[in-house]
């Protein structure tokens, strides 16, 4: 990594990972911040606000919740709020304490602003119903940041759920060189092309950082998050993202070439990798089905040993999302 600005950013990230591994009190502090979620007052403000639509960056496509009227109702309400109270949602997102003034852009953080997210016990069930509305709001927030911010570094974070992307963002948000951070899956990179192009066209530097973990470690992290916060991760989504990510990154590298920096962080070893071929080799653990089998083996072992609750197992085995 020869870019001195990027080198400083990665050094900060590496120090953060070392502290997480070596200082239990620091890990507890960071996890407390992560699991706090959006303050209830922000959701209340959105509910009280009047209609204030703004153009959205994309169409919100509803998922099919046939036979599940509760989820269908959650989805309809989320879509209505996203289209009718867009300005209030974006303003609340900027004030969300975990977003660094709105610079950290993540659809999961937008979910915290919807009424269905208020109860932790309901979050795993509500997740899919809020997904598409939150994804479009995240794209809209990214466009707003490009409109109002001076060009800096736009960092795209990706990796299997449970890799530690959101945890890592806490360190990177403190670095003023990072103007925005967009967390999202790049295993199917088509939706990322216009976002990255928009950043480049406005003079921003763009780097993609893939955070890597073994499937088993990622599963342990999502299960821990489920019990602490209510949102875990399905095996289908985890395996699809990890199994397809090397090809997705290769497609992005082929399209943008030297206009972007492609990097990987192995959270298991602490290694930073900036050679595209080495990144592909490190991240390639097999196709989605191979990774799915590893995850199922580990989940079954936890279940057989009595270390897994029925609710945690159910959320890991079910999703409406298709990747």
Question: Model segments located where?
Answer:
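Glycine-rich phosphate-binding loop of ATP-dependent small-molecule kinases
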Residues: 1-323
């Amino acid at each position: 990594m020869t870019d001195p600005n990027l080198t400083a950013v990665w050094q900060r990230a590496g120090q953060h990972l070392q502290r997480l591994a070596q200082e239990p009190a620091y890990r507890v502090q960071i996890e407390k911040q992560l699991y706090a979620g959006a303050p209830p007052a922000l959701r209340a403000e959105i509910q009280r606000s009047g209609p204030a639509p703004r153009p959205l960056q994309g169409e919100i496509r509803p998922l099919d919740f046939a036979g599940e009227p509760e989820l269908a109702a959650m989805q309809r309400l989320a879509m209505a709020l996203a289209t009718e109270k867009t300005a209030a949602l974006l303003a609340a997102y900027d004030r969300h304490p975990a977003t660094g003034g709105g610079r950290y852009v993540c659809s999961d953080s937008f979910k915290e602003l919807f009424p269905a997210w208020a109860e932790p016990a309901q979050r795993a069930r509500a997740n899919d119903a809020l997904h598409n509305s939150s994804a479009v709001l995240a794209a809209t927030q990214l466009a707003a940041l490009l409109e109002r911010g001076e060009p800096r570094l736009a960092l795209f974070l990706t990796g299997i759920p449970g890799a530690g992307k959101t945890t890592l963002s806490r360190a990177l948000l403190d670095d003023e060189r990072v103007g925005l951070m967009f967390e999202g899956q790049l295993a199917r990179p088509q939706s990322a092309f216009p976002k990255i192009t928009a950043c480049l066209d406005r003079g921003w530097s763009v780097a993609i950082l893939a955070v890597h973990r073994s499937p088993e470690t990622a599963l342990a992290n999502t299960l821990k998050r489920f019990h602490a916060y209510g949102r875990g991760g399905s095996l289908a989504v985890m395996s699809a993202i990890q199994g397809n990510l090397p090809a997705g990154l290769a497609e992005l590298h082929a399209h943008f070439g030297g206009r972007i920096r492609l990097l990987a962080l192995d959270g298991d070893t602490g290694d930073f990798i900036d050679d595209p071929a080495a990144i592909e080799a490190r991240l390639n653990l097999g196709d989605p089905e191979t990774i799915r089998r590893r995850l199922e083996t580990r989940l079954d072992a936890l279940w057989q040993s009595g270390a897994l609750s029925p609710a945690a197992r159910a959320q890991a085995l079910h999703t409406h999302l298709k990747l």
